[in-house]
Each structure stands twice: as C-alpha cells, then as structure tokens.
Design a protein with these regions (language model features):
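Secondary-structure boundary/capping motif
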Residues: 12-13, 55
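Short alpha-helical segment that forms part of, or immediately flanks, the ligand-binding pocket
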Residues: 17-22, 33-37
Length: 111
C-alpha cells in the first residue's frame, strides 16, 4: 500500500511513482529533482540531504509515520482523491488531448 522510494537521483519524472499513485499507493520519497512536481500534492516528502546518514534517519522516521497512519480515515480520503486525480490526469485520453492541443496551437502559429 506504500511505495517507499528514497530517491537520490534528480529525476525529471517518475513513471513508477505515477503508476503507484494511480493504483492508490502512498508515495514516500525525497523532494529531489522533479519528484515533488510529479507527486504533489499527494506524495509524502523527505527533504533531500547529501549527508546520507541524515537522509536515512529522516526517511525512516517519515516512512514509519506513513505506515502508522496509512489506514486513518483522513489518509484514506487522500488516497481515494489521489487515485481519482492521477487516473484522470495521466490517462491516455488526457495525454492525447494535450498533444492534439499542442499541435493545433503550433499549426495556428504558422498561419
């Protein structure tokens, strides 16, 4: 139910995080790279720290808290909203419409 992803790489996006959120999993990750943009406002974030000992301590504390609170009513409401939002936002229909609009605008600029 929880996707524990203590990333130390500045990713530009994360398909695994998107798929996890679409499945209704809570994502616990760092705020490095575009992970915040990919997972916000639903992800649970740990501030990235180049001191990996500090990062490990902070991440472990945050993950334990997420495990403890996962089944709370408040968190389950958040997970349901997350799943619904991600499945609408990242569906093939939504993506294809975005590309269509992009190309339509590009054609209009040439005219």
């Amino acid at each position: 139910h929880i996707f524990a992803y203590p990333s130390i790489w500045p990713e530009t996006s994360c398909i695994a995080a998107i798929e996890s959120m679409a499945a209704g999993c809570e994502v616990v990750t760092t705020n490095l790279g575009a992970l915040y943009e990919t997972c916000a406002p639903f992800g649970t974030f740990v501030n990235f720290d180049r001191n990996f000992s500090n990062l490990e301590k902070n991440y472990t504390k945050t993950l334990k808290n997420s495990i403890k609170n996962f089944w709370s009513e408040k968190n389950q409401i958040k997970m349901n909203l997350q799943k619904e939002t991600i499945n609408l936002t990242y569906s093939w229909n939504a993506r294809s419409l975005e590309w269509k609009n992009f190309f339509d605008e590009a054609r209009n600029l040439k005219s």
